[in-house]
């Protein structure tokens, strides 16, 4: 039963991470301090009185995705056939970055879980068409990871 609670908590942390990272598409953070400000200003965090120093799973996802964005975009571009990241919708791109980050940089998140959670985020924030697009890219990345043509960073 505890595992289910943890999964629910992680899912809500992913949603928070998505919202903060999505917002950065419109008001980019230039450094880690601005990234922390964006996190602490998000409604889910500020409604709880904010956090002096960001901690927890959501923050780890935000910081890791933001820090590794260039490498994540290279992976996404590789598997998004005939799509440049500039052409991918902001919602879809944010979800892809988060899920690919989890696949490659988080030893505690199996690729199948990263794919499933990416699809869940697309159900919550995207539209029906984006799910297939996201699933296709994430599945291709997972297969490349399994085949060893891309490697984990942890």
UniProtKB/Swiss-Prot annotation:
BP GO terms, sorted: DNA-templated transcription termination; transcription antitermination
S-S pairs: none
Assigned keywords, A-Z: RNA-binding, Transcription, Transcription antitermination, Transcription regulation
Domain of life: Bacteria
Function: Involved in transcription antitermination. Required for transcription of ribosomal RNA (rRNA) genes. Binds specifically to the boxA antiterminator sequence of the ribosomal RNA (rrn) operons.
NCBIfam families for this protein: nusB
The name this protein goes by in its record: Transcription antitermination protein NusB
Organism: Oleidesulfovibrio alaskensis (strain ATCC BAA-1058 / DSM 17464 / G20) (Desulfovibrio alaskensis)
């Amino acid at each position: 039963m505890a595992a289910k609670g943890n999964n629910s908590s992680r899912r809500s942390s992913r949603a928070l991470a998505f919202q903060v990272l999505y917002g950065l598409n419109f008001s980019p953070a230039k450094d880690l301090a601005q990234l922390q400000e964006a996190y602490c200003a998000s409604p889910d965090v500020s409604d709880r009185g904010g956090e002096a120093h960001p901690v927890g799973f959501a923050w780890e996802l935000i910081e890791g995705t933001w820090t590794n964005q260039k490498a994540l975009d290279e992976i996404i571009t590789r598997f998004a056939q005939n799509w440049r990241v500039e052409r991918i919708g902001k919602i879809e791109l944010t979800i892809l970055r988060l899920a690919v980050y989890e696949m490659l940089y988080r030893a505690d998140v199996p690729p199948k879980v990263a794919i499933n959670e990416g699809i869940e985020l697309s159900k919550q924030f995207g539209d029906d068409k984006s799910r297939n697009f996201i699933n296709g890219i994430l599945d291709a990345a997972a297969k490349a990871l399994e085949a060893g043509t891309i490697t984990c960073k942890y």
